[in-house]
Amino acid sequence: MKFIDEATIIVAAGDGGNGCISFRREKYIPFGPAEGGDGGNGGNVWLQADENLNTLIDYHFQHNFHAENGKHGQGKNFTGKCGKDLTIKVPIGTRVVDQNTNEILGDLIVHQQYLLVAKGGLRGLGNNHFKSSANCTPRKKTNGTKGEIRRLQLELILLADVGLLGLPNVGKSTLIRAVSAAKPKVANYPFTTLVPNLGVVQVHKKQSFIIADIPGLIKGAADGAGLGIRFLKHLERCRILLHLIDLAPADQSSPVENASIIINELKRYSEKLATKPSWLVFNKLDLIDKREALNIAQTISDALNQKHNYYLISAMNHQGIKTLCRDIMLFINKNK
């Protein structure tokens, strides 16, 4: 199924039913008291997180949603039936924004979590509500109020513990294939990854973490170049970022300059994202002498003022991966 992580929908809660003007009329009571019933409340609109969904594609085809209106009141003090609530299911990780005010209404991050997005209108009152000892036959009632109408921006932000960052073709997809059961496309050309991929890394029997791979970033990504900038939001909820660096770029580019590109683009996109815990992971150790790899890694680590230890791995040969995954698990457990 196509991965769609943004959608716009219009939700309308139900209107409240009107109150009724009615009087008791029986054979021997020609001018009885008021007995007009109240209307029913309008139905609310809710969003509900569903772990069985992973895309917002359905809402690219259906944009308008309306809860049921409340029924009008009737004679003999019959209250109108309340309108049924409408529940719209969305993937876990969906952020809901009111497009008119840019207010974030909520984040749905737990299975079956509910969020009220449009409140139904209140019921109108029948004339029975307005009778008194001085006036038992009032000709007064109120109409139900209108239900809320909202234009909502739905943004799916993946829930992952670890996010992979890097230029195109540095081996992010190869790494996620090596450490999990995920099977993203892998090929020797840029932008093989077109959408984010998630993988579950099982470190021990009862310990695992989720890792996210997004399309590679390029210089100018913060200005819209390439594919990765659109998907950077999926790293917002990650606890730690792994910055993958190619030790032996096929285009003979400088690993130091390549590392700086990612750091700069991340800062330009979001200072908050740029300050997340980030580890340097140097990939393709199988293509270069280990001593040379250590020199490159140390140079880049010093240039970027990296405080945490860096890692040398070969995603292709699974070299150094076990240690990396173990340390990630320790970090996650420590920072819960």
Swiss-Prot record:
GO terms for cellular component: cytoplasm. It is an enzyme of class 3 (hydrolase). Mg(2+) binds at residues 173, 193. Residues 1-159 form the Obg domain. Pfam families: GTP1_OBG (PF01018), MMR_HSR1 (PF01926). One of its GO terms (molecular function) is GTP binding. Its cofactor is Mg(2+). InterPro entries: G_OBG, GTP-bd, GTP-bd_Obg/CgtA, GTP1-OBG_CS, GTP1_OBG_dom, GTP1_OBG_dom_sf, OBG_GTPase, P-loop_NTPase. Keywords: Cytoplasm, GTP-binding, Hydrolase, Magnesium, Metal-binding, Nucleotide-binding. GTP binds at residues 166-173, 191-195, 213-216, 283-286, 314-316. It comes from the Bacteria. It is found in: Cytoplasm. CDD domains: Obg. GO terms for biological process: ribosome biogenesis. Its EC number is 3.6.5.-. An essential GTPase which binds GTP, GDP and possibly (p)ppGpp with moderate affinity, with high nucleotide exchange rates and a fairly low GTP hydrolysis rate. Plays a role in control of the cell cycle, stress response, ribosome biogenesis and in those bacteria that undergo differentiation, in morphogenesis control. Belongs to the TRAFAC class OBG-HflX-like GTPase superfamily. OBG GTPase family. NCBIfam families: Obg_CgtA (TIGR02729), PRK12297.1 (NF008955), PRK12299.1 (NF008956), small_GTP (TIGR00231). Monomer. This is GTPase Obg. It comes from Baumannia cicadellinicola subsp. Homalodisca coagulata. The lineage of its organism: Bacteria, Pseudomonadati, Pseudomonadota, Gammaproteobacteria, Candidatus Palibaumannia. The gene is obg.
